[in-house]
UniProtKB/Swiss-Prot annotation:
Keywords: Repeat, Signal, Virulence. Residues 31-75, 96-140 form the LysM domain. The lineage of its organism: Eukaryota, Fungi, Dikarya, Ascomycota, Pezizomycotina. The keyword Repeat applies. This is Secreted LysM effector Vd2LysM. Secreted effector that enables the plant pathogenic fungus to manipulate host defenses for successful infection. Binds chitin, suppresses chitin-induced immune responses and protects hyphae against degradation by plant hydrolytic enzymes. Chitin-induced polymerization of homodimers forms a contiguous ELP2 highly oligomeric super-complexe that may precipitate at infection sites to eliminate chitin oligomers, and thus suppress the activation of chitin-induced plant immunity. The LysM (lysin motif) domains are small globular domains involved in binding chitin in eukaryotes. Vd2LysM contains 2 LysM domains. InterPro entries: LysM_dom (IPR018392), LysM_dom_sf (IPR036779). Forms homodimers in a chitin-independent manner through interactions at the N-termini of EPL2 monomers. Homodimers are further polymerized in a chitin-dependent manner. Disruption phenotype: Shows significantly reduced virulence on inoculation on tomato but not N.benthamiana nor Arabidopsis plants. Seems to leads to enhanced colonization on Arabidopsis. Pfam families: LysM.
């Protein structure tokens, strides 16, 4: 196999950016999401830190189909002052990496990734959850997409 083809092929097996879906916040812990082509029920639920049962109950639907593109559905809409964190997903697991930036706090990162600061601290060997260093990468749950 040619080296350039091998490099291209292996690039598809490595980490990939996982961009989360966003919602229009209503101020009540809820919001609206507009269904896009290629969406599936499990991925939408994972992006909004909920279950397919909640989406079914709130929207009276049991799945997402292609004829629902551009349909607005109600979702839990977690509010984090406008910051939406994404992860670099490991294609071989449900985890990924998040790059810590100045001003980040572990509790806020945990909130965005549908987990707790204690869980993130354990996953990353962080002894003091109140202190995390900017410009470092940590492992985070990254199940969407």
């Amino acid at each position: 196999m040619r080296p350039d083809v091998f490099v291209l092929f292996t690039a598809f097996l490595g980490p990939a950016a996982a961009y989360r879906r966003t919602c229009s916040h209503t101020g009540k812990g809820e919001g609206w999401y507009i269904i896009r082509r290629g969406d599936n029920f499990n991925a939408v639920a994972a992006d909004f830190c909920t279950s397919t049962n909640v989406l079914t109950e709130w929207n009276h639907i049991s799945t997402i189909t292609d004829n629902m593109v551009n349909t607005k559905i109600k979702v839990p809409c977690r509010w984090n002052a406008g910051k939406q964190r994404d992860c670099l997903k490991d294609q071989k697991s449900s985890n990924g990496w998040y790059h810590i930036v100045s001003g980040d706090e572990l509790k806020d990162i945990a909130y965005d990734f549908c987990t707790t600061s204690g869980s993130l601290a354990g996953m990353n060997g962080i002894s003091n959850p109140d202190y995390i260093k900017a410009n470092t990468d940590i492992v985070v749950p990254c199940s969407w997409n």
